[in-house]
């Protein structure tokens, strides 16, 4: 059957480059105001429509605070049933706790899930949880390190997600 899906949020699902310094400086109120200026990566809308249409269980695992993740999910109407934010499981990525929490919320075992992210910590957390890990190269700021992160798969375009979840 189809895999349950775990996504990182920033630079994986949505290009939030414009919010990076605000997030780094924990200027959350200003970041919230500027979510409308972020952009969905090319091809991601189609991927999310397939996830929605097939009722594929989907979680976001992020090191950002819950209100930030919730606001982006609402802004883009993402087909996400579960959010594991900075506030929801500790220690955060690269520790597996957030990934294990996502599995628990979705009611699936690690072998029935697949995880997508743009950072080494995404790959490390997924691997530590026993989840198939996918390095997403379209938004990453860690290209060199990500190449050597021990991922299960590497992809360069969002539409490649569909071949991996089927």
Each model region followed by its residue ranges:
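A short, structured active-site edge motif that brings together acidic residues
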Residues: 79-93
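Short, acidic loop-to-helix structural element flanking the phosphoryl-transfer center
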Residues: 32-60, 67-70, 74, 96
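Surface-exposed amphipathic alpha-helices with a cationic face
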Residues: 45-53, 103, 123-127
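Acidic, Mg2+-coordinating phosphoryl-transfer loop and its flanking beta/alpha structural elements
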Residues: 115-154
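Active-site neighborhood of HAD-like aspartate-dependent phosphohydrolases
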Residues: 1-40
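Conserved Lys-Pro-Asp/Glu-containing loop-to-beta segment of HAD-superfamily phosphomonoesterases
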Residues: 95-123
């Amino acid at each position: 059957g189809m895999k349950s899906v775990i996504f990182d949020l920033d630079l994986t699902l949505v290009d939030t480059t414009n919010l990076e310094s605000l997030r780094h400086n924990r200027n959350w109120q200003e970041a919230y105001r500027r979510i409308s200026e972020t952009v969905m990566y090319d091809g991601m809308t189609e991927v999310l429509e397939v996830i929605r249409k097939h009722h594929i269980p989907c979680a976001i695992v992020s090191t950002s605070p819950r209100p930030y993740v919730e606001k982006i999910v609402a802004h883009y109407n993402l087909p996400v049933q579960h959010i594991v934010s900075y506030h929801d499981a500790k220690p955060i990525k690269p520790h597996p706790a957030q990934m294990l929490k996502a599995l628990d919320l979705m009611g699936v075992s690690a072998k029935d899930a697949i995880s997508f992210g743009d950072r080494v910590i995404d790959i490390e957390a997924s691997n530590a949880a026993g989840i198939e890990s996918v390095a997403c190269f379209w938004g990453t700021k860690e290209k060199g390190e990500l190449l050597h992160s021990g991922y299960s798969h590497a992809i360069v375009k969002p539409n490649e997600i569909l071949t991996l979840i089927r």
